């Protein structure tokens, strides 16, 4: 009897050692990280990482294990794990993992890994040569007895693979791990999934993934990756600011007396807030008061220079299922509708908002944004008030020259840029920028040379360190040399002389037969008729310009 007790005493410690040595999901998926002992709420569809791991079918290798070098033919497989975090508690956070194969390798439509055609000169000679032909393995039943033995189509915890259509073409096993739980799935060269954050505590967490590929007798580890994600009870928001004449949108410096547009973007990739009532409360910090908007875009004009701090509070009233009416030991606290202190427990506002919803069928969530901006005097407007062509002598340059007289309102510019493009203002033909010094009045004369006569679209931009403004015009440029102008004048005078002679002859023939010798009154009448005819003649050959503004956009001004 004593001998039996001795055998039993030896067996019990041995069994305890075996149990202690059994590998668990936490040992494999934590990758050496020691997670704090915390009781996490169960995530729907996930399992505890204290479950046993089948190390025989899914071997575990340390980071420095030499077997990693031979886990994949032709090189090393890397993986990229990304997330759309941060996530508002209660919404879904999505993760996407993508495998990146060695050069010249890709996945085909059947889930096999093949060499790309004509990838490099030293690539394998045979076209579409397989790196891993898993379809052939399955068809030949080379991996166990595929008609009766399904022991290999299981996850590390022993659960069978889901047999949905096309499952045999998914030759990678993805194992995700976070907050003491794991999720397992099969897939191809990429996989994505979403997790509801209702039962995940607020704060930063790590999502880790381990990927195995199908092998002949076991699954082979090929890559690991991890990323950080955030669960918060504050609505994630981003505010973009823009202004018409602002030169640099990223420096938070804007112009006085010019509207600033504020556009609010709520980060809600899972559309958790789609059915919520959202409002935006603005305080621009300039003493103008509070503004409540129902839309995500608003504008505000600062009439004073200086530094200002703007504050935005976004409120979302989220409908939730009504909870059963149960007596509560305490009344709701007003802290739900006030700003949470930075020293408070981050999980407290979440619990209060969920346990004490207004009316029992919705909860409040808030998002906050604060930014400092600087308002300065800027260039508000630029006008082209005059364009003059410059006549050149034959010894000077033949390129036509035009002087532009421009004025501006606001601050004085420090640089001027002149851009020339085709008549449609679409194809640029060049731009010239020069520094300028304006001390008294914003009136500048800008001389611009053109390659040849023609019609051009001209843009003149005046700018300083913080702002810029633009004026445009469509102009028609004539030849610039004086010889060309002189030739044009002579031709015009010659034509004028010819037409004058013809006109004199016509007048002589017409009025000769009506000219009485002795009637002075009739003479005066004929003189009036002659004057009217000469006026008509002058109007025909010398029409007055009806264009008062040479910068009209409808037609080019001739300079």
Swiss-Prot record:
Compartments in which it is found: Membrane
Keywords: Glycoprotein, Membrane, Signal, Transmembrane, Transmembrane helix
Membrane-crossing residue ranges in chain numbering: 488-508
Extracellular side: 23-487
Annotated region described as Disordered, given as residue ranges: 329-356
A molecular-function term among this protein's GO annotations: integrin binding
Topological domains, Cytoplasmic: 509-559
Membrane topology: Single-pass type I membrane protein
Keyword Cell division included in the entry's annotation: no
InterPro entries cross-referenced by the UniProt entry: Ig-like_fold, PKAT, PKAT_KLD, PKD/Chitinase_dom, PKD_dom, PKD_dom_sf
SUPFAM superfamilies listed in its UniProt record: PKD domain
Glycosylation sites: 92, 133, 145, 149, 192, 199, 248, 274, 307, 311, 459
CDD domains hit by this protein: PKD
Leader sequence residues: 1-22
SMART domains reported in the protein's UniProt record: PKD
Any single Pfam family the record assigns to this protein: PKD_4
Residue ranges constituting the PKD domain according to the UniProt record: 239-326
One GO cellular component term noted in the UniProt record for this chain: plasma membrane
Positions with biased composition (Polar residues): 335-347
GO biological process: cell adhesion
Tissues and organs where the protein is expressed, per its UniProt entry: Melanocyte-specific, restricted to the pigmented layer of the retina and the epidermis.
Role description: Could be involved in melanogenesis.
Family membership noted in the UniProt record: Belongs to the PMEL/NMB family.
Descriptive protein name: Protein QNR-71
Species the sequence originates in: Coturnix japonica (Japanese quail)
